[in-house]
Amino acid sequence: MLIKLLTKVFGSRNDRTLRRMRKVVNIINAMEPEMEKLSDEELKGKTAEFRVRLEKGEVLENLIPEAFAVVREASKRVFGMRHFDVQLLGGMVLNERCIAEMRTGEGKTLTATLPAYLNALTGKGVHVVTVNDYLAQRDAENNRPLFEFLGLTVGINLPGMPAPAKREAYAADITYGTNNEYGFDYLRDNMAFSPEERVQRKLHYALVDEVDSILIDEARTPLIISGPAEDSSEMYKRVNKIIPHLIRQEKEDSETFQGEGHFSVDEKSRQVNLTERGLVLIEELLVKEGIMDEGESLYSPANIMLMHHVTAALRAHALFTRDVDYIVKDGEVIIVDEHTGRTMQGRRWSDGLHQAVEAKEGVQIQNENQTLASITFQNYFRLYEKLAGMTGTADTEAFEFSSIYKLDTVVVPTNRPMIRKDLPDLVYMTEAEKIQAIIEDIKERTAKGQPVLVGTISIEKSELVSNELTKAGIKHNVLNAKFHANEAAIVAQAGYPAAVTIATNMAGRGTDIVLGGSWQAEVAALENPTAEQIEKIKADWQVRHDAVLAAGGLHIIGTERHESRRIDNQLRGRSGRQGDAGSSRFYLSMEDALMRIFASDRVSGMMRKLGMKPGEAIEHPWVTKAIANAQRKVESRNFDIRKQLLEYDDVANDQRRAIYSQRNELLDVSDVSETINSIREDVFKATIDAYIPPQSLEEMWDIPGLQERLKNDFDLDLPIAEWLDKEPELHEETLRERILAQSIEVYQRKEEVVGAEMMRHFEKGVMLQTLDSLWKEHLAAMDYLRQGIHLRGYAQKDPKQEYKRESFSMFAAMLESLKYEVISTLSKVQVRMPEEVEELEQQRRMEAERLAQMQQLSHQDDDSAAAAALAAQTGERKVGRNDPCPCGSGKKYKQCHGRLQ
């Protein structure tokens, strides 16, 4: 009550922010007459003037009024478009490390030119981030004339571009590209073998378009660069034959062992669990197929990989549906983005799931991959010094933006009042009744010339509605992953009188739906149009535009509620742009996924009490409230998952930053000999300590073991036993110094043969290659640890704390292994001539190039551990202190490599 009263008196935080910014807008407006008087050359010269002022120490924020006034005036001259006051407000919000919520059609692309210009003045680069390549290219080309008029350079960063072109794009003042490409370039730069191979500059300012889609919807899916792992495609095929024999059971009853089902599905968490009966049948079938020996258990340690195959195959059959989660095109399984409905060419599910789906669909199974580098969008975008974003729907996720990214959300008012009518939801008992009602509504709307946009949540649903419309004889366009190339053209004409467009989720975001259709698209279709033709097209469009407005504007039909209210609002937001008329309505059924999983019992009870008949719809505040509560429940659960993922990924992120920082230092120096000398001392001290414990009696020394270790691991054939026989007075410390001196002497002799410069080059290459190899193995082990860490909860331990503790131990052990392997490799390498060192270096380069060609870029679902299979194959089991050391010395681990821990 008190908060409401205070808000009424002083205004909300949003109101206070806008009030403060409106004062600056008044200053910008007052500068307009002065700017209009400037010649083109004088206006262009302002950029150089601003840069000089910044160099002299002026603060960027002080330039806002004048810089924004310059951009507005330049836009009037170049585009004939003047920034509205609300766009100036949006520009200021974006400069203040905030999220600007601006409704569809309010000109977000033009708004972005203001903060992009201002922050580009620093010379550190601005990254404008879009959701797909088409929008990146379109926005860059559209805004290029404005920025170039003002003396700034513009770059486009697209997938598949050669490194020199990418480097040029990043060197530009303002770079346009997709979130995926920026992230992958960051990972690739941190796998480079020379500073010249890197393409990015320091990450300065990121301006993210459709920020909710990138920072929230895609936050759970890390970017992964992977290389090929061991081939196990045959096993996927063999296990796939077994799965159709299993029957789904709604609930597992392991105690009474009743029911015919073999597995249960938890749709909320998207997990599949074998029942007791299912486990027995699976084991019988595996024995029958000759995959497993009789009497063996599927859960025995020896069958851990087999269990992985069974789980992947079960998930592929029970949870993943063709034309919903993926499509099959040209003999390839292509993932469909659940948020946008677009296909994600080249991306693959992790943990063997993609191979299992390929086996299910009978297409060629591609090899599993091993993670080489990985980062989540949450952690990538937090690397920027300054981050801001814009979207039409951010307010519902304001808490998440604030708690995870430290970004406040500011709702920017519309230029004209919003008059769209959002009609109450209609709920039917069955999907068939719902679809029929949608068809009737479309018939009524199109009969009076009103355009209709139908939003569906999957390709399967869009094709179902399309088939029904075809049966009813209604002409329509389908916009889903299968018709990707025509996306922008179809969306542009969706406002044509009586046009019916079916869009999967929010395919086509970023392209405005103009009432009456797009006259620009009609002009673009003509070859060398005359002024008369253009005028006629414009006049025809005006007639159509007025007719659509009279019919009620664009009508939006939602065929289902999405898990998130924000996605529903995005669909509604396609109508009612810039004060246009419009309407929207959602049609639901008790068979919809959201209703079935989260709201079914309560709402079904209400509907029965209200005595519903077939074909009847319910329209009641109770039902709407129950649906909103179901959505809040899902949103809250998804937020918790993302927050938990971030807490776990932060552990890996600290390690990633340490490794990448060390790697970049290595790349930037030409001489690492001091580092090599320092770690050689550490390695030899630790190695000698394992056989000659400090301050110990001579009887405790293991001289034969030490000699063997030095010979095997460092190619040092030293007669230590002879030294001790000839010099009984040889002290432990003197012996250590002599061994180290001998190793340095042998190494220096190699250096004399090949030359100091060549040796420095080789040392650097060995350090980089060893670091990359161990980091790759560490990532696999971390994924494997993450997969099973939740089980620690059963031992009354906090899984997060256990994960932090164990991953730190693994990281420390990896750094020790790095030292040991670098010195071992450098000691063992045999070189006689400079040409041989050059040849070794050439081999290393060729191997790096081969791996680069085999790398796959994937944006993978983090619900499964990305490299569990690999870790099971390559991750070493934990060695007990009293176990024999894995190095083969024959000593106990605690007296050998255990001392390095």
UniProtKB/Swiss-Prot annotation:
Induction: Repressed under conditions of excess protein secretion capacity and derepressed when protein secretion becomes limiting. This is regulated by SecM. This is Protein translocase subunit SecA. Gene3D superfamilies: Helical scaffold and wing domains of SecA, P-loop containing nucleotide triphosphate hydrolases, SecA, preprotein cross-linking domain. GO terms for cellular component: cell envelope Sec protein transport complex; cytosol; plasma membrane. It comes from Escherichia coli O6:K15:H31 (strain 536 / UPEC). It is found in: Cell inner membrane; Cytoplasm. Zn(2+) binds at C885, C887, C896, H897. The lineage of its organism: Bacteria, Pseudomonadati, Pseudomonadota, Gammaproteobacteria, Enterobacterales. It is an enzyme of class 7 (translocase).
